[in-house]
From Swiss-Prot:
The record's note on its domains: Has 4 structural domains; the N-terminus (residues 1-136, NTD) interacts with XPB, the central domain (residues 158-250, CRD), the nuclease domain (residues 260-364, NUS), and the C-terminal domain (residues 414-481, CTD). The CTD (residues 374-481) is not required for DNA-binding. The 2 nuclease domains are found in the NTD and NUS domains.
Ranges where the record places region C-terminal domain (CTD): 414-481
Name this protein carries in UniProt: Endonuclease Bax1
Family: Belongs to the Bax1 family.
Region of interest: Nuclease domain (NUS): 260-364
Cofactor(s) essential for the protein: a divalent metal cation
GO biological process terms held by the UniProt record: DNA repair
InterPro entries, alphabetized: Bax1 (IPR008508)
Natural source organism: Sulfurisphaera tokodaii (strain DSM 16993 / JCM 10545 / NBRC 100140 / 7)
Any GO MF annotation of the entry: endonuclease activity
Amino acid sequence: MLPWELARFSIVKDEVLPHFATNEDLDLANEIISLFKAGKKLGEIDEEIEYLEKIYDHKLVRAFVKLLTRLCEFELDSPIPPIQIRRELFKYGPVLDEKEREDIIQKVSKKLGADIMRFVFSDLDEEKKIIKAPTISAEDLIRWYNLSLLQTLLFKAYKLTVYVSSNWKEIIRRAKWLGLMYFAYDKPLRFEFLGPATLVKLTEKYGRNLAVLLQFIISSQNWKIEAELVLGKKFKRVYKLKLANFKELKELVIDEKRFDSSVEEKFYKDFTNVIKGWKIIREPEPLVVDNRVFIPDFLVEKGNLKVYVEIVGFWTKEYIKEKLDKLKKVKYPILILLNEELGKEKFNGMNVITYKRKIDISLVYKWLRELENKYLNEVKVDYTISGDIISLNEIASKLSLPVEVIRKNIKIFPGYIFLKNYYVSEKFLEKLRNENFDNKSLKELVSAYGDYIVEVLEFLGYKLKWQGISDAIVIKDKKVN
């Protein structure tokens, strides 16, 4: 982004027209790039561009310099605050001759343990010395300028509508990471982001995050943006900005922090580490509610039980109202993790856990357990069986339910006997009844038949005589025919 005073645009009727740089500005870009050399101070460059400002648009000249400065590496910062160095020097008052000046410098240098004249003004921009000049082509500088200009204008946005034909999931994923407020619509697919101009606080951070998102929007094959900008000092007016598939924009990887540490990231890590048996999915598939696309922050699931999780952080009143309308129409359970500053009363009748700085994962786990217990008590268990041997584990796995739930809802099927953990067909059981398992090794029988044979042997009247902890001899109970 650029300082607002360097933004170049004109207004025609109610539309904002950005003044992008073009190939006609290549000579200027090359000339300014050539001024940035190792060993130079920024103050020297400022003096050298004065004549260029008289020939070219001074805003464009200053913007090029501003961007190139961000790519420079400067001499290391002072080990001592420069203001402290100046305070120590100025204690001695005005100096009238060179020898007295040198004596004072030596005294202060010795006291502070540093080459003070090297750092005395190092906190001033004009005194910063370049140790590594930027390596960038004039073409890339122009594209970067154009992207920065567009980002700067969008900082004044009240609303930004985005149309894309590809990578829309990536855009939404980034938007969530960046904490941007948005609405998604179907037919045609579009996203409506609330702009910084809708906020009364944190506009700087929000605006910068929206600028970061723009880089992902323009990476789509086909994209279009329509923005409503709020401009004017005394009298505010809303103007429109439209742009589609403009090629002279470039994403550059600059040393900047793209994403802040977020509540969402901490929640995801805590959930993964603490809550076992549940699977958490970040950015699940979108849900369509009344032709609006709703993409929850997370989906957590255990078997057939699905719960969507939405983290409500820094939202405006209007955004909350719109979101609530959608949340109430989603048919699956939704858990809302709510920043307590927003007020819980707005979410009456919904599943809400409040948080202050971070989400208490133990409260989430407790809520999920209560929901799971309620679900298991109300779930309708229906199943059929086929084959000779059917285990409860097999049925539970197919139904995505705990074995104990199946056990509480055992069904009786004609032609089958239910033992402790297995259904066995009567025909197969009769066949086994005709076998003689007397004096056989249990270990060998389990290996030949499977684990179910233990329960079958007990049903048929056999007993086990253990020969240690790992094997037993099967003995026919003489009382049983």
